[in-house]
Amino acid sequence: MRHSLLLAGAVSVFILAGCDNATPDSTSQTHSALATRADTATNDKQTRRVQHAMGVTEVRTHPERVVTLTNEATEAMLAMGITPVGAVRSMTVAGQDNGVWYSHFGQTLQNAGTVDLGDEEQVNLEAIAALKPDLILGIKQRQEKIYDQLSAVAPTVFSETFMGAWRENLLTYADGASQKEAATALLAAWDANAQQLKADLDAAGKLQQQIAVVRFQSSGARYYYNDSFATDIIRRVGLARPPLHDKEGFAEGLTRERIPEVNADQLFYFVMETGNGKASAAEQSWLAEPLWQQLPVVKNNAVHKVNHETWNKSYGILAADYVLQDLRAALLPTGSDNNINNNSSDSQSKG
């Protein structure tokens, strides 16, 4: 991902700037090398205390074998240049080539040999132990009951919950991995992109548009309030929400006779497909409803289908970047920037 590449470049420049141009003799080189190894060994054994959702945990200052038990933790580590040795499966990855992780980071994990650790709510404890991790990152909302078992394997740091907390969770995971400064830089870069989008929308007279977010699945439909991942980002950009949607909370179930409730200036929707085609069939059924067809937002060609993984399930910094890209492409289309991302390849390959 470009943010992590910028950070890596900055670190390299810092290291090079600190190098002495003088050439020491071989004895000095030997002493320096031995001292460096000793310092490194000492640093590797150093620990620090981290406050998190389950209390305070003592972690290694420089963990090398990190296990991630949420997708947002996986994204956090990848964005900071750390590839987990093991990671839980992504939820609802139907149709993805890798079959285990979301397409915007799955190939990176696959190429690195990252071990599949099962589902977020049913992790494979034996597989985790076999990896001999020195840090485990998880979430209280999913794994509170097995926290003690995980802590018996390695120092374990938990975030609290998914809803409306993607930024806080990034900082929690980064703190566990001694990468809080890097995470702060990532958020600053993301904020700069969000503020630039806000300024561009304002200049185009489009910042006051009301934005609705809708999900279709086999069992029905819903629209989202302000505490979902995507709507939190929409609000941070400064875009407006329809009055019915502009409230604290997660989502509202939708019935077909209440379709007019989702009208807005712009509507983004995604489909939670699980591999049997039923959600896609439900999508087509909803879109064919007369009440849907009569919506002003539909008549104005202001409906945009986006990726369910990045907009609704992954909750990470990489996904947050994709949502910004999709908002720009939909609301400020240009000749070279008018495609909504379907995330068919890893974000890190997009540069």
Label the model's feature ranges.
Residues 91-97, 143-145, 159-172, 208-231, ...:
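Extracytoplasmic ligand-binding site segments that recognize negatively charged/polar headgroups
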Residues 1-7:
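Bacterial N-terminal signal peptides that target proteins for export
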Residues 204, 265-351:
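Structured C-terminal subdomain patch of bacterial secreted/periplasmic proteins
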